[in-house]
């Protein structure tokens, strides 16, 4: 009975691990991988039979495939729209090198900054690339298997309202490695949403969960005099994001520049 089970297991392994071009038989009579030169067979001490084993490069390839799978899953949770996954440092056109470099360095130093609960505040006019850099940070960190979520506040509020136990939402929020709050200040200024925004920022602040915020609100407004929750929201953001970064360029909207550069045929057809 045992021999049959063993034989079946060996035959099944042989189907999965086969000799490939470049593989060779070593001096010990075992099959070796032609790429990494590690054994693809092993002799059982039990009965002296050769059994297939996974070579080193196949193990590394399998690990990398598993990592990429996990990164894809994390990215699908992180973003609402597939297009957001295309915002990467590799696709950055380099319109604002200083901001790009700061965002890259944030990712490179994330382990250290995360322990301190420090995030990044990107502020500036419409269309200058604030969201792009926030998404690029999220993409870079999910690729390193960090749990990240990107939200706009109204979207976050709907998710909060539609859930069963609301406390579970905040438990999930502070379990993240990074939260990205996109377009702060663009949401409807209602009492309920302002109160919710404070609760979100306060939960992240108290748990030292780092967050990246993008906003069209000026630094003067952020540091100005406000009453109640709005004042406490901005104070907590500025404490956790101590070096606000202005995202702007003399040429104006990056979004408009990108569209022009990426559609030369359209421009040619219109004669512009």
Set out the residue ranges of the language-model regions.
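Short glycine-rich substrate-engagement loop in P-loop NTPases that contacts/grips substrate
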Residues: 97-104, 123, 138-178, 187-195
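Pre-Walker A (pre-P-loop) alpha-helix and adjacent loop at the N terminus of AAA/AAA+ ATPase modules
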Residues: 90-120
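Interdomain "pre-motor" coupling segment immediately N-terminal to P-loop NTPase/helicase cores
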Residues: 32-80
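Walker B catalytic acidic pair
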Residues: 182-184
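Conserved adenine-nucleotide phosphate-binding loops and their immediately adjacent elements
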Residues: 77-90
């Amino acid at each position: 009975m045992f021999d049959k089970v063993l034989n079946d297991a060996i035959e099944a392994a042989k189907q999965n691990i086969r000799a490939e071009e470049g593989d060779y038989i070593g001096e010990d009579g075992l099959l070796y991988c032609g790429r990494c030169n590690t054994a693809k067979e092993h002799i059982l001490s039990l009965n002296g039979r050769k059994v297939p084993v996974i070579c080193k490069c196949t193990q590394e390839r399998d690990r990398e495939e598993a990592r990429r799978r996990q990164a894809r899953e994390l990215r699908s949770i992180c973003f609402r729209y597939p297009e957001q996954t295309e915002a990467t440092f590799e696709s950055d056109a380099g319109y604002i090198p200083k901001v790009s470099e700061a965002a890259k360095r944030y990712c490179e130093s994330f382990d250290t900054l995360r322990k301190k609960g420090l995030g990044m505040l990107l502020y500036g006019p419409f269309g200058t690339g604030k969201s792009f850099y926030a998404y690029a940070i999220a993409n870079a960190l999910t690729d390193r298997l960090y749990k990240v979520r990107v939200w706009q506040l109204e979207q976050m509020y709907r998710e909060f309202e539609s859930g069963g136990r609301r406390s579970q939402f905040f438990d999930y929020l502070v379990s993240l490695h990074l939260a990205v709050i996109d377009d702060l200040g663009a949401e409807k200024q209602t009492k309920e949403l302002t109160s919710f925004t404070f609760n979100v920022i306060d939960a992240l602040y108290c748990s030292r969960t780092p967050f990246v915020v993008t906003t069209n609100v000026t630094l003067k407004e952020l540091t100005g005099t406000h009453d109640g929750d709005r004042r406490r929201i901005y104070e907590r953001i500025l404490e956790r994001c101590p070096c606000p970064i202005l995202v702007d360029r003399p040429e104006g909207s990056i979004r408009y520049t990108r569209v022009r550069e990426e559609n030369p045929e359209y421009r040619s057809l219109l004669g512009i």
